[in-house]
Amino acid sequence: MSLIGSDRIRAVVGLGATGLSCVRFLASKGIEFYVVDSRENPPGLEEAKKLCPEERIFTGDLDVLEALGVTELFVSPGIALRTPVLSRLAERGVAMRGDIDLFRDYVDAPFVAITGSNAKSTVTTLVALLLQACGKNAKAGGNLGLPALDLLSPNTDFYVLELSSFQLETTHGLQADLACLLNVSEDHMDRYKDLYEYQRAKQKIYRGCKAAVCNKQDILTAPLLAEGVPVRAFTTKSPDLKEYGMLEDGDGAWLCRGVERLYHTSQIALKGSHNHANVLAALAMIELLGLDIMSESIAKV
């Protein structure tokens, strides 16, 4: 059910791919909004003009937002919330939201949210492929491929979203059915004051989640969750019970769950320790989604 109120004055800020997806979505729902972009002639301008009255489109300066009396902004991920006009509006109580907030309001199927400094595209793609191999209508997107709002359609069994830290900044109470933070290392330090501010943005993926997967070898991925929320950890070392990891014996190296051997590394098309970690994370997610990780369909992927 939508959480969008009818008395709000909204604007989409930025006409990149994500901003345009917000324009398309809001227009499809018959919701009034402004469009504002700091560029005089942004690449999505012509499409926006087909969906929004020209008198509600402003380009060349974001400061016009203050004159519009906005109460709710859908900010494109490429625009930092530290931008002066956005900071001033936030101080006045204007809601700073993003496309993933909109997605969450309207999605009617389970969704998986995946982030990390590295490998998030690989793992997002792999989880979607594994779900499809199990006969599920799974759609992948977000920061990868199609924007999340463009994925929404009937008869979808699962959505698998790659999310960037920029997207998570404007996401409040994500409530993913399954959230995964793969790793955290210094990235986008031109946007964040330090590693820990960046980590805090990444950690927002866990807010309200029903289950989680984290990296045992990276303490910055460890979630703080309510008691009873299922969590699976993965590691490229020997795993503890219920963890996913690697074991070696006379037959070679194995991907394992606890002491249970799952797949020999020779069966894995993706080679190298980093890719084994990606596969382990994906298997942990498939288990938490209630599917058989040892099925013939999974083994063939």
Give the residues covered by each predicted segment:
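N-terminal leader/targeting and accessory segments in enzymes
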Residues: 1-98, 102, 271, 291
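Short, hydrophobic beta-strand segments that form beta-sheet elements in well-ordered domains
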Residues: 12, 33-37, 57-58, 73-75, ...
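Short, surface-exposed amphipathic charged segments that create phosphate/polyanion-binding patches used
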Residues: 70-76, 110-116, 242-255
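Adenine nucleotide phosphate-binding catalytic loops in nucleotide-utilizing enzymes
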Residues: 8, 13-15, 194-196, 230-301
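Phosphate-binding loop of NTP-binding sites
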Residues: 27, 65-68, 77-230, 284, ...
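Short, solvent-exposed loop/turn elements at beta->coil junctions and helix N-caps
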Residues: 62, 166, 299-300
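Cofactor-binding loop segments of dinucleotide-utilizing enzymes, especially the Rossmann-like FAD-
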Residues: 15, 38, 116-117, 143, ...
